[in-house]
Amino acid sequence: VLNTGSPITVPVGRVGLTGLTVAEHFRFTQANSEVSALLGRIPSAVGYQPTLATDLGGLQER
């Protein structure tokens, strides 16, 4: 547990794992975009997958 000087202490392991999980979700999304580009499919005008909003919505619900 990390004492930040505030009344709330933050468990160090959870913070690191949360950051790692978020990073992995974004890597997955980026990999989907790269695969679409390699296959010659344009997902959208800005380059993101059409399911990006759904994927990130599922992440936010967790």
UniProtKB/Swiss-Prot annotation:
Matches recorded under Pfam families: ATP-synt_ab
Record's keyword terms, sorted: ATP synthesis, ATP-binding, CF(1), Hydrogen ion transport, Ion transport, Membrane, Mitochondrion, Mitochondrion inner membrane, Nucleotide-binding, Translocase, Transport
Primary site of residence: mitochondrion
Catalysed reactions, semicolon-separated: ATP + H2O + 4 H(+)(in) = ADP + phosphate + 5 H(+)(out)
Keyword Signal: no
Gene Ontology annotations for the cellular component aspect, listed alphabetically: mitochondrial inner membrane; proton-transporting ATP synthase complex
Description of what induces expression: By E.ampelina infection.
SUPFAM superfamilies: P-loop containing nucleoside triphosphate hydrolases
EC number(s) on file: 7.1.2.2
Record's subcellular location: Mitochondrion; Mitochondrion inner membrane
Assembly and interaction partners: F-type ATPases have 2 components, CF(1) - the catalytic core - and CF(0) - the membrane proton channel. CF(1) has five subunits: alpha(3), beta(3), gamma(1), delta(1), epsilon(1). CF(0) has three main subunits: a, b and c.
Similarity comment text for this entry: Belongs to the ATPase alpha/beta chains family.
UniProt-recorded name of the protein: ATP synthase subunit beta, mitochondrial
